[in-house]
Amino acid sequence: MNESIECDVLVIGSGAGGLATAITARKAGLDVIVAEKEPVFGGTTAFSGGVLWIPGSPHGRRQNAADNREAAREYLRHECGAFFDAAAVDAFLDHAPAMVEWFERETCVKFVPTLYPDYHPTAPGGVDIGRSILAAPFDIRELGADMARLRPPLATITFIGMMFNSSNADLKHFFNAAKSLASAWYVCKRLVTHLKELALYRRGIQVTSGNALAARLAKSALDLGVPLWTGSPARRLVTERGAVRGAELQRDGKTVIVRARHAVVLACGGFPHDRARIGRAYPHLARGGEHHSPVPEGNTGDGI
């Protein structure tokens, strides 16, 4: 006998998009469930650099008061070329700064400015500072028992599991450790602290970048009482009269039908680990080429 559960909104996927959706829906008074196929939450976000490009954010306005909406729009028009979508760009520029303010006001998600320029700062409308922000560093002990379910960061962007804070002088101290006594002392203290964390928790607990963003979003969702079902892959969507009404999940070895009264949100990523689909999208693979992606192996295009 299949188990059946009802909610208002079912979110499939636990990266930044899925968790942000779940938090927003829960804040609106809706009953939300987040289902994640892998045993850890955070998705590709937890592996990523976690940089948000948000022209006009509160942090950006303080960092570069000369920047403005019109310049950001001109930059996007130049970068997008024939793919420029005026309605989508205007919606983004109008609402993205308010999104940042809302999350900082309503949740434990906090951001910090960065020194990153636009990808092409000399292009029309481009700037060399003020549009990119990062989640503030986070101590994952605040997740309590759920700390073990946060996807660890990508190993290649850590040093023996230690993450770096690119929004301050952290990295500079490591680069200057052989040249400056102050930097050498800073690095020694960081290493000792990190080794203690490894001994106690078997992982670094001071996280940055995308791992901090995923952790802060997860903490906010959990504090709101949103269930984060890990190890619960969606097998199929449930439809009635041509409309999606829920999804069939595998959870704890059982089939669970989750019926959503308002919406099913597919926030389960792309298909970098579906070789057949990649082969159809990139014909040159037939000639011997191959794409390798560092994203989690669970990204197989389930929602496409």
Segments (PLM) and residue ranges:
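N-terminal Rossmann-like FAD-binding beta1-loop-alpha1 element of flavoenzymes
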Residues: 9-34
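Extreme N-terminal leader/targeting segments of oxidoreductases
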Residues: 1-9, 27, 211, 215
